[in-house]
Amino acid sequence: MSQQVIIFDTTLRDGEQALQASLSVKEKLQIALALERMGVDVMEVGFPVSSPGDFESVQTIARQVKNSRVCALARCVEKDIDVAAESLKVAEAFRIHTFIATSPMHIATKLRSTLDEVIERAIYMVKRARNYTDDVEFSCEDAGRTPIADLARVVEAAINAGATTINIPDTVGYTMPFEFAGIISGLYERVPNIDKAIISVHTHDDLGLAVGNSLAAVHAGARQVEGAMNGIGERAGNCSLEEVIMAIKVRKDILNVHTAINHQEIWRTSQLVSQICNMPIPANKAIVGSSAFAHSSGIHQDGVLKNRENYEIMTPESIGLNQIQLNLTSRSGRAAVKHRMDEMGYKESEYNLDNLYDAFLKLADKKGQVFDYDLEALAFIGKQQEEPEHFRLDYFSVQSGSNDIATAAVKLACGEEVKAEAANGNGPVDAVYQAINRITDYNVELVKYSLTAKGHGKDALGQVDIVANYNGRRFHGVGLATDIVESSAKAMVHVLNNIWRAAEVEKELQRKAQHNENNKETV
C-alpha cells in the first residue's frame, strides 16, 4: 500500500526571497488561497519576526486558510518563536518551523559555537515551540554538509524534545541525488526514535538537482517534500513542487507513494504565481512551460496523432490545462461569461463578475473575439486592482515618431482632484512616466519593465509588469490593455497606489502604537 508524501509549499517564504519587490498582503493571500485550492498539506507563508508586514501577511493568511496547515518560520531564538506563535494563533491549528545550522562550517564561522551548544539550543527552542502547538518542525540548516554522525545526534535530540517533523535541507544545492538518498537512509539507520517524526527534505537547485535530490530522498524514506511553485527561490531557486508532484504521480510504479494534491489546479496555480511574482515561466520548463506538451518533430507528431502515449507520459488535461479555447464576443451576455469562468474552474469568490463583465465588453468592442486567456488576464488584473485607489488614470495622449521627440499629456485623478501634466521622454512610455512623476512629485525610479503578450495575434492583450524604487523600497505594478502605452501607464498608476497604500498602513501602525502607548500611561 502506498504512503502519502506531505507537500510543504514555501512559495510565500523562501520563494518570495527571489523577488525584486515584496508582495503585498493581498497578493500573498491570493497565492495562499490558490495553494489551498491545489491541496498543499502545509504552506509556509512568512518569517513574522522579520517585519510588521510579514507578521500581518502571516496573520491574514492564518485567519483565512482553513484546509491547509499554515506555518511560519523562526530561528532558534526565543523572540522569533514567540512572534511566530502570536501571528499564527488566529488559526485553528498551525505549525512553527524553527531551524539552526548544523554543519561544521556554519557552526564555526557563522554561529561561533560548538555542536553541543547547538544541540542544547535546539532542544530548548523546540520545547518552547511545543508550548504553543503540537506541530513543530525542526530544520538542520546545511544538513547536506553535516557529517552523518553529527546530524544523527541533532535529529535524535530534536525528536526527543518534541519535534514532529525533521527537515533535512540541502541548503546550498551541493549534494548529488545518490548522496542525498544516503543521508536519509543513514538517519533511518542511526536515529533510534526516527519513527516518531516525519522526515522532510528541502532542496535547492544550484547544480540543477533539486527535484532529483527530493525524489531520491522520497525513495529512501522521506515523507515530506518542501519546495515552491515554478521553483522560485534564492539563487538558482527551490525544488519545483509541480515537477515533484507530477513525478510522484507518473512514476508511482517505482516510488510507491502518492500526494493529496488536486492535479487539475497545478497549471492555474503556476500561472498565478508567475503573474503575481512577475517571473515568466520558461517555454521549456517541465510540466508548466508553454512547450511542455508541444511536438514539432514530424515523427513525434505522427506518433502522437496515432496514440498520444507514444510521446506523452502525461496529458495537458492532467494538470488542468484545457487546450480547447472557446471565444466570446460583445454579444455574449453576463451569464455566458460566468459560465465560461465556471468551466475554467474559477469560483465566484475569486473575481467580481460585474467588474469582469464591464472589462470584457470594452475588450470585445476593441478586438471582436475574447478568448479564455483574455478572460483569465482580465480576472487577474481585476483582482489586483480591487483595493481602494487614490490614483486613477483619467486620460493620456502621446505623440511620437522616428524623427520626433516623444511627448505625452496625462490626466490623473488624485483623490478627489484631477491633475494634468505634459512631458517629453525617450519614447512614448518614458514620456508618460515623466508626466506622471510631475503630477505626483513621487520621483519614482523605474527598476524593471517587462511586457508579455496575453494571447495570440496582433490584437493580443499586452501585460506590463514594472518594479519601481521609492524611498529605498521596491514596489510592483501591473497593467493590461491592447495598447502597450496604456498598459504601461496603468502599471505605473498601480505602483503609485501601492506606494500610497503602504504609507496609509504605516500611518495606521503608528496610530495603533501611539494608542497602545497612551493606554499604558493611563494604567
Swiss-Prot record:
It is found in: Cytoplasm. Residues 392-523 are annotated as: Regulatory domain. Its cofactor is Mn(2+). SMART domains: LeuA_dimer (SM00917). Keywords: Amino-acid biosynthesis, Branched-chain amino acid biosynthesis, Cytoplasm, Leucine biosynthesis, Manganese, Metal-binding, Transferase. GO terms for biological process: L-leucine biosynthetic process. The keyword Zinc-finger does not apply. GO terms for molecular function: 2-isopropylmalate synthase activity; acetyl-CoA C-acetyltransferase activity; manganese ion binding. It is an enzyme of class 2 (transferase). GO terms for cellular component: cytosol. It catalyses: 3-methyl-2-oxobutanoate + acetyl-CoA + H2O = (2S)-2-isopropylmalate + CoA + H(+). Pathway: Amino-acid biosynthesis; L-leucine biosynthesis; L-leucine from 3-methyl-2-oxobutanoate: step 1/4. Belongs to the alpha-IPM synthase/homocitrate synthase family. LeuA type 1 subfamily. Catalyzes the condensation of the acetyl group of acetyl-CoA with 3-methyl-2-oxobutanoate (2-ketoisovalerate) to form 3-carboxy-3-hydroxy-4-methylpentanoate (2-isopropylmalate). This is 2-isopropylmalate synthase. It comes from Shigella sonnei (strain Ss046).
